[in-house]
C-alpha cells in the first residue's frame, strides 16, 4: 500500500495534469484561499439582501422567484436589473409573456435603452436565445418571464385540445442541464419568474406547486416565495402593497429567512421604507407614536413623511443604511479602532426646525 507521502505526490501530479488539460482551477480544495467571494446583485430591498445572507442574488447561479399574480415578481426582477446596470453590467429580459411595460421599467430605474429584450415565439426559442447570450460571456443578468409561458413548439403547432403530457418539463430539464455550467463559467445570474398552480386531490399539506416540472427546483440555488400581505393606503386611496418574501431554498446561506418591504405603485420597492423598518428593528431609528427619530432629531410624523424626508436627504439615508450594514456584519466598521466623530452636526444642520423634539 502506498505511503501517505506517495499518495500526496500522486495527487499533486494528477492535479497538475488536470490544470494543464482543462485549465487552472478545474479542481481545487474547498477551503482554498483562491476561491473568490460570492459576487451578488442587490435586490433593491435591504431586508431581502440580509435575508439572503450574502447581500443579494448570487452571480453565476439560477434563481427562481414565484408567487401569486400581482405579488411583485416582475417588480423585484426589474430592481435587480437596475442594480446590475448601475454597477456597469449588461442585462437581458426574455419576455415570454409579452407583457413587459417599458414605462414602468424606466420608473424603477432601468435603463431601457441598454436593456436587451426578446419576445420569443416558443419555449425552445426563448431558452436557445438565453443559452447563446450566456455563452457570449458578456451578460451579467438574464430574466425569463415566465416559466409558465415557455410553451413548447409542438403545443403551439398542435390543435387546441391535444394532450402534450410532460413536454414543458422535459424542455426545462434539458435546458437547465445545458445552462447550469455555462452560467457558472460566465458568472451570469439567471432569474426564472414562475407562476403558481394547484395540485388536484391534495388533502394534506399545501396544494400549491410551480409550473415547468421539478427540474428548476433542483437546479435553482435560490428560490424566493413572494406574497402580497397587506394593501397600503393613504386615507382611502391604495398606494401600494406590503410584501413578504420567504427564502424557501438557499445554497449560499441558511434558508427559510423572511423579509418584508413595501412596493409602492409607480415607484417600486421603497428602499427608504426598508431603512426605516430595519432602523427601528435594530434601534438605530426610534419610533415614538407616529414620529420617527434619528439621533435625537425627528425625521417626520408617520412613515410616509419620514420616507419622503429620506428621499430628499439621500446622505442621511446612506448613513442609516451603512450603520445597519455595519451592525449586521455585512460591511466592516471603518471606525472600529478610531475615535468617534461628531457626525451629528450635519444632521442638525438639515433639521434646524425639528431640533429638541
From Swiss-Prot:
Highest taxon of the lineage: Bacteria
Keywords attached to this entry: ATP-binding, Cytoplasm, DNA damage, DNA recombination, DNA repair, DNA-binding, Nucleotide-binding, SOS response
Cellular localisation: Cytoplasm
Keyword Kinase: no
Gene3D superfamilies: P-loop containing nucleotide triphosphate hydrolases (3.40.50.300)
InterPro entries linked to this entry: AAA+_ATPase (IPR003593), DNA_recomb/repair_RecA (IPR013765), DNA_recomb/repair_RecA_CS (IPR020584), P-loop_NTPase (IPR027417), RecA-like_C (IPR049261), RecA-like_N (IPR049428), RecA_ATP-bd (IPR020588), RecA_C_sf (IPR023400)
GO CC field: cytosol
Any one biological process term the GO annotation gives: SOS response
Pfam families (UniProt xref): RecA, RecA_C
Alphabetized GO MF terms: ATP binding; ATP hydrolysis activity; ATP-dependent DNA damage sensor activity; damaged DNA binding; single-stranded DNA binding
Family: Belongs to the RecA family.
Function: Can catalyze the hydrolysis of ATP in the presence of single-stranded DNA, the ATP-dependent uptake of single-stranded DNA by duplex DNA, and the ATP-dependent hybridization of homologous single-stranded DNAs. It interacts with LexA causing its activation and leading to its autocatalytic cleavage.
Name this polypeptide is given: Protein RecA
